[in-house]
């Protein structure tokens, strides 16, 4: 009896992913853009994460994102798009692009989340952010200031705003799949669901459905 119960349980669990995928409904769990936004991942499929370093929900989502990255398909690129939906978010978006310009995103990304969302540190201008980079040992303050004022970072900020406007992003965290599908945590119900829906939509793009 116990053996049959275990077999039934295993069979049920094996069916769960397919059942869940069938439940992801357009207009309920995600929305489709009438005009897709530009992707920047070349031949790879793109999953864009729109985030703000000061966002508690984005901060809570990071462990889920990191776990997902460990088994991320090779044909998918995770693109980080720092939100600048409000004027006071702009310095934090610029901090990300300055870090990318300096090649130190991996060394500062989590630390910026910890400082801004976790500790609520006052890092709201170039001097404070440059000092923070130096404090973390990833770049000299002068290097951060140079990157901050560069044409490349200004261009990245402009493209990031265009992406957010085109995708009609109104809050963070938000996922955008292949420039076509937008997933919010409110619609998805959880961070885990956001990524499950993203995986479902990425597979939809692979199959051409």
Feature-to-residue mapping (PLM):
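Sec/Tat-exported extracytoplasmic proteins
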Residues: 54, 69-72, 99-103, 112, ...
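Structural microenvironment flanking redox-active thiols in thiol-disulfide oxidoreductases
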Residues: 73-102, 107-133
């Amino acid at each position: 009896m116990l053996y049959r119960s275990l077999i039934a349980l295993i069979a049920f669990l094996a069916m769960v992913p397919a059942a869940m995928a069938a439940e992801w409904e357009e207009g309920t769990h995600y929305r489709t853009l009438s005009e897709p936004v530009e992707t920047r991942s070349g031949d790879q499929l793109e999953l864009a994460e729109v985030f703000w370093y000061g966002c508690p929900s984005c901060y809570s989502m990071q462990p889920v994102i990191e776990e997902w990255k460990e088994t991320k398909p090779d044909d998918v690129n995770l693109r980080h798009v720092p939100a600048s939906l409000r004027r006071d978010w702009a310095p934090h978006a610029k901090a990300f692009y300055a870090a990318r310009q300096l090649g130190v995103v991996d060394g500062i990304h989590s630390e910026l989340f910890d400082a801004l969302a976790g500790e609520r540190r006052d890092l709201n201008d170039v001097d404070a952010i440059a000092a923070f980079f130096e404090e973390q040992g990833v770049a000299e303050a002068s290097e951060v200031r140079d990157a901050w004022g560069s044409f490349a970072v200004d261009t990245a900020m402009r493209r990031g705003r265009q992406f957010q406007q085109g995708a009609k992003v109104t809050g963070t965290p938000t996922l955008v799949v292949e420039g076509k599908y937008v997933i919010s945590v409110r619609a998805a119900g959880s961070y885990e669901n956001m990524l499950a829906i993203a995986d479902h939509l990425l597979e939809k793009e692979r199959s051409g459905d």
